[in-house]
From Swiss-Prot:
InterPro entries: IsoCit/isopropylmalate_DH_CS, IsoPropMal-DH-like_dom, Isopropylmalate_DH. NAD(+) binds at residues 77-90, 282-294. Its cofactor is Mg(2+); Mn(2+). The keyword Heme does not apply. It comes from Clostridium acetobutylicum (strain ATCC 824 / DSM 792 / JCM 1419 / IAM 19013 / LMG 5710 / NBRC 13948 / NRRL B-527 / VKM B-1787 / 2291 / W). SUPFAM superfamilies: Isocitrate/Isopropylmalate dehydrogenase-like (SSF53659). Homodimer. Belongs to the isocitrate and isopropylmalate dehydrogenases family. LeuB type 1 subfamily. Catalyzes the oxidation of 3-carboxy-2-hydroxy-4-methylpentanoate (3-isopropylmalate) to 3-carboxy-4-methyl-2-oxopentanoate. The product decarboxylates to 4-methyl-2 oxopentanoate. Pfam families: Iso_dh. Its EC number is 1.1.1.85. This is 3-isopropylmalate dehydrogenase.
Amino acid sequence: MKEYKVAVIPGDGIGVEIVGEALKVLEKVGAKYDTKFNFTEVKAGGCAIDEFGVPLPNETLEICKNSDAVLLGAVGGPKWDTLPGEKRPEKALMGLRGGLGLYANLRPAKVYDILKSASPLKEEIINKGVDLLVVRELTGGIYFGERGRDIQNGINSAYDTERYNVEEIKRIAHVAFKAALKRNKKVTSVDKANILESSRLWRETVTEVAKEYPEVELNYLYVDNAAMQLVREPSQFDVIVTSNIFGDILTDEASMVTGSIGMLPSASLRNDTFGMYEPIHGSAPDIAGQDLANPLAQILSVAMMLEYSFNMTEAARDVEDAVEKVLNSGYRTGDIYTEGSKKVGTKEMGKLVLAEL
């Protein structure tokens, strides 16, 4: 029997409820595939501020470092919005990414046939199908570059610096090409190489890496055009690879193409099999503790964990198929409910997925 250690961070708001359902799924998968998952629950975010005075306690980071993967719910909420920036719950995410060396963020955006009506796009666009993956560089670029304020010609000024080196670009490009090999073998590299020097280096480096993957088609888009194409014809995309700031914007846009943010998981990875997995939605404190939250993004995050950290691809497909079967049977949480479907709560949705596994 294989054994894996999973650090569990329920976090704030609905995190506790949806993580609870996801862990049941992981346990059932373990029983089916003769694998034991050992869970250690730790705190980060607002609940950690309340208890320890910091968003990311050292103990949490150490336990995560000594695990095979991390399952994260959601952090934050209006309760902590008045705190200074460094003390806010969201700082826990930056601390986890940096402390665990996670440099690649993978966000799939898929429109399920049965949920097409949720998309804000026209039917003729969405009917072509949307199943793309955005691979975003997570630890470089303008968010981590030199910044500051000064006085220029007697006027208050501020600056931020976009900087990348070849190695940072190479490693994220490899992640994208390897992902494409398992998908439809197409990578779109998004940059602003007509203006930015950092983007020119990005394009040169991605072009070099592409030579190692002759079976994968590579094309390029400037970021402004990519943003337009995502809503004009999202079906053209398979894997999109891009820098930190461009990825931050495009992943949010891609999530709204689906119209169902409660369905979308994400993974943050590094060079080995370790990863941190979480839904892309927030902590939704307004519906916390009321059995209203959609647990499917969290459950699909477990599917990504099975695939990327534990190399259990068949098990990952089982989870994805179970989710799709439940949706096809007409069950919906409130966020994706439409007239004629059957409305269920967090716990019931979790039970329905378990029954299909």
